[in-house]
Amino acid sequence: MPAAAFLGLLSHLGYFIHGEHHMKAMALFQASLLLPPALTLATAYLIDLTILEATKIVAVLLGTYLISLFTSILLYRLFFHRLRGYPGPFFARLSKIWHVSKLAKKDNHKHLQRWHTKYGKYVRTGPAELSIADPDAIELIYGPRTKCTKAPWYDISLPLVSMHQNRNKREHDRRRRTAWDKGFGAKALRDYEPRVVGYAELLVEQIGAFSGKPLNASRWMNYYSFDVMGDLAFGKSFDMLKNGKSHFAIDLLNKAQGAFGLFSPAVWIFRILTRMPIISADYKKFVSWCENQMLERQKMKVEKPDIASWLINSPPLSDDPFVNRMWLAGDSRLIIVGGSDTTAATLTFVFHYLAKYPAEILKLRKELENVNINDNEALQSALRDLPHLNGVINEALRLNPPVPSGLQRMTPAEGLDIGNHHLPGLITVFVPSYVMGRSEECYEQPYEFIPERWYSKPEMVKRKDAFIPFSAGAYSCIGKQLALQEVRTVTAKLVTKFDVSFAPGEDGTTLMEESKDIFTTELGDLFLTFTPRK
């Protein structure tokens, strides 16, 4: 027994306390299942014992080992860890399992809001993790000259990898430069404009067909963004707007991303579960569907430029065909999730606030009086600089950012200084977007929807550098301008054609209370009426 106890202590201090182990999670899990029976059989054979006698001996030894191991881990995390001085929920200091256990409703962003309200700007949300609601941290963690790197979270889907999830900065920058930058450059965006406008007009037409009857705006904004994504990314529409019903892939996406919302705080749990056939079925179906979209696109001949063409024709990142295939599959999923979920969420929240504050619609219409809404060729340049339109969109993004809980980074080995705080090296840090959007340090009246704060009342934005709904620096969202193009176009066309209001019995509560943080946002229902303008 003393030897088993010593081995448990040695395992922690000599191995588990050092480096990253999330990629070995499945191997460790399998070992924990296979080792006890193997040791039992070996003990029975070598010492000539019955299975029952051997089982008792192994149980005592393994029990002693595990008690020693976990006692050492817990004592270290409580009293000796480099983050021991930072406040936070007690059980969060011990294990990320506790954090996962709080997320049955997939509302991580709201938990973070409560924790920051209780504990302050720096909250320990895991054994080696800090959530930081400090505007001074943003440039140092996400800015172009940051020394922080991507955290272990980005390994969550390996071997599937995308530009977004790649932790190797050199590979990330090469992929962005040779493929993604071209697919989202100024010329490419101009080429996409007619299709963005075309789908916006189809959305207007389909909403008009309701003749003022209630409709689920969350669904229709999803139909629009998914159809645009399909066309611009893979050269084909999914015809959701045309058919007025959801594509099965949206349900797959929500189920697959739902696992992110629940388990992504503990990457090692996610990696174990996604390797269990029954549990991971929906996730694997979605990943397979994403990969198939890219494979089908590779076989197509398209006349109009699309994003996939730049990805397919870019120089390979490896001599291994499997690695290159995983890149395309990962980038395919990135396009589908990033290109549909985020745009749909922003549009839905924009129209929630317009229904709640109808005076904003009148302001938008006045601003749009000098814009020919039917001149599709000049529309984007006309909308781009409209202050109130952009103010409405910015307010929706501030209060309901596309990635509510923020993006994780790892501090450099030497640590990171933020004001009077010296953060230890090689810990996970992040700035929660949802929390920052409601920060009184950054905004006057942070809970109020005031579009003018972005142009005529700049004093209401105390820290403009805290507004990063599309992240910042080298890892900022490459689809930002396309997303804004889509949101501006739909907003302008709909408020020009319709009066917007909550449907009878609707007040927006369901959207606000039931939307889920699944890394991006899975929308709750929002029933609106769009009545033709008189």
Locate each region found by the language model.
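Cytochrome P450 heme-binding "Cys pocket" and the immediately downstream C-terminal segment
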Residues: 355-360, 463, 480-518
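N-terminal membrane-proximal hinge/A-helix region immediately C-terminal to the signal-anchor transmembrane segment
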Residues: 2-175, 197-202, 206, 224, ...
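Cytochrome P450 heme-thiolate monooxygenase catalytic core
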Residues: 150-158, 191-346, 363
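Conserved cytochrome P450 K-helix/beta-meander segment immediately N-terminal to the heme-binding cysteine loop
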Residues: 413, 431-458
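C-terminal helix/juxtamembrane-tail motif
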Residues: 518-534
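Short, small-residue alpha-helix embedded
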Residues: 342-355, 490
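Hydrophobic, well-ordered secondary-structure elements that form the walls
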Residues: 364, 396, 426, 449, ...
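Conserved cytochrome P450 K-helix E-x-x-R motif and the immediately C-terminal K′/meander segment
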Residues: 105-112, 288, 292, 377-419
